[in-house]
Amino acid sequence: MEPNRNCPLFGGAFSAILPTGAIDVSDLRPVPDNQEVFCHPVTDQSLIIELLELQAHVQGEAAARYHFEDVGRVQGARAVHVLSVQPLCLENLSLRGCCQDAWSLSGKQQVAKENQQVAKDVTLHQALLRLPQYQTDLLLTFNQPPCHSRSLGPENLSCPPWSLSNFEQLVTSLTLHDPNLFGPQ
């Protein structure tokens, strides 16, 4: 994938700038309709964009923690640990016109891969963009498994590992083009 290319998401209803080399996981395996999932071509890094039902019973920082813990529960994490939670400046978001609240969270989850006994600490960076007028919580997740997950020898330097700034660019560039995706309002 070309660097700094605006890529359509959810059938063109959204678009965002994805990092260089991002592979659409839906080309490799089934992905739920409410998700867009991309993986790095060399590392085990991944980016997930999810449209979730608005969790109106939690507000502010508690909403970011709620979604982080929910991801851990779904993945069968043996432990979850929040490192930091910070509000995101709405003015920096392309979605500032429809996003009423935004949070970033960094944390670690101890997760075992499918068919493996040993759990590894995976660093997760999340952005929660709350769109109450669409009854939607938009959750973006950047999974950063341990660095030694795969070989990063000289032959693989053509696509360096993604950085937190790549994730931040994804979050800030995310744009809504077709609100009909959410159904009648």
Curated annotation (Swiss-Prot):
InterPro entries: Mog1, Mog1/PsbP_a/b/a-sand. One of its GO terms (biological process) is mitotic spindle assembly. Highgly abundant in cardiac cells. Expressed in testis during prepubertal development. SUPFAM superfamilies: Mog1p/PsbP-like. The keyword Phosphoprotein does not apply. Changing E36A: Deficient in binding to RAN-GTP and in GTP release activity. It comes from the Eukaryota. It is found in: Nucleus; Cytoplasm, Perinuclear region; Cytoplasm; Cell membrane. Induction: Down-regulated in mice lacking Ovol1. It is a peripheral membrane protein. Keywords: Cell membrane, Cytoplasm, Guanine-nucleotide releasing factor, Membrane, Nucleus, Protein transport, Transport. Belongs to the MOG1 family. Monomer. Interacts with RAN, both RAN-GTP and RAN-GDP. Competes with RCC1 for a common binding site on RAN and thereby inhibits RCC1-mediated nucleotide exchange. Forms a complex with RAN-GTP and RANBP1. Interacts with the cytoplasmic loop 2 of SCN5A. May regulate the intracellular trafficking of RAN. Promotes guanine nucleotide release from RAN and inhibits binding of new GTP by preventing the binding of the RAN guanine nucleotide exchange factor RCC1. Regulates the levels of GTP-bound RAN in the nucleus, and thereby plays a role in the regulation of RAN-dependent mitotic spindle dynamics. Enhances the expression of SCN5A at the cell membrane in cardiomyocytes. This is Ran guanine nucleotide release factor. It comes from Mus musculus. The lineage of its organism: Eukaryota, Metazoa, Chordata, Craniata, Vertebrata. The gene is Rangrf.
